[in-house]
C-alpha cells in the first residue's frame, strides 16, 4: 500500500503476510551488513555493535510475527514465498567511503520499511484489539 487509506483497505490476514514478507526480505541484507562492518578496519566498535543489534532485533520481531501468524493460520508459514536478496551490487567499488555510503542507503531503506511495519502493526492492533475504534 502506498498510503494509510490503501493500507486500511487490506484485510488483516494480508497485512500480516505483508509484514512477514518485509521482515524476511531483510534477513540477508542485514547479515551482509554485519559481515561487511566487521571487515572495515577503522570502524568503531559501536557501529559493529549497532549493526548486530539491528540484525538481532529484526530477527526477534520476525520470530514474534511468525508465532502470531502461526496461531492464526497454522501451517501457512512454511508455504510463504519471498524474494531473496540478490546480494550487493558488483558495481559498488570496494573503497571504504563507497561501502559506508552503501550502508547508509541500506539503513535508509530499513528505516523506511520499519516505519511501514510499525504503521501496519498499529493498524492491526486498532482493528483486532480495539475493534477499529482508534
From Swiss-Prot:
Keyword field: Disulfide bond, Hormone, Secreted
GO cellular component assignments: extracellular space
Official protein name in the record: Prolactin
Protein family (similarity comment): Belongs to the somatotropin/prolactin family.
Source organism phylogeny: Eukaryota, Metazoa, Chordata, Craniata, Vertebrata
Native organism: Bufo japonicus (Japanese common toad)
Disulphides: 126-134
Subcellular location(s) of the protein: Secreted
Keyword Disulfide bond included in the entry's annotation: yes
GO MF annotation list: hormone activity
Amino acid at each position: 500500500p502506498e498510503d494509510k487509506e490503501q493500507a486500511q483497505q487490506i484485510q488483516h490476514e494480508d497485512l500480516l503476510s505483508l509484514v512477514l514478507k518485509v521482515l524476511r526480505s531483510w534477513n540477508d541484507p542485514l547479515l551482509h551488513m554485519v559481515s561487511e562492518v566487521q571487515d572495515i578496519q577503522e570502524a568503531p566498535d559501536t557501529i559493529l555493535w549497532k549493526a548486530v543489534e539491528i540484525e538481532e532485533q529484526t530477527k526477534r520481531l520476525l520470530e514474534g510475527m511468525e508465532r502470531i501468524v502461526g496461531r492464526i493460520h497454522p501451517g501457512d508459514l512454511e508455504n510463504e514465498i519471498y524474494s531473496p536478496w540478490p546480494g550487493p551490487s558488483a558495481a559498488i567499488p570496494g573503497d571504504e567511503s563507497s561501502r559506508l555510503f552503501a550502508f547508509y542507503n541500506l539503513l535508509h531503506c530499513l528505516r523506511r520499511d520499519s516505519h511501514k511495519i510499525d504503521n501496519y502493526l498499529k493498524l492491526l492492533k486498532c482493528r483486532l484489539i480495539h475493534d477499529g475504534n482508534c
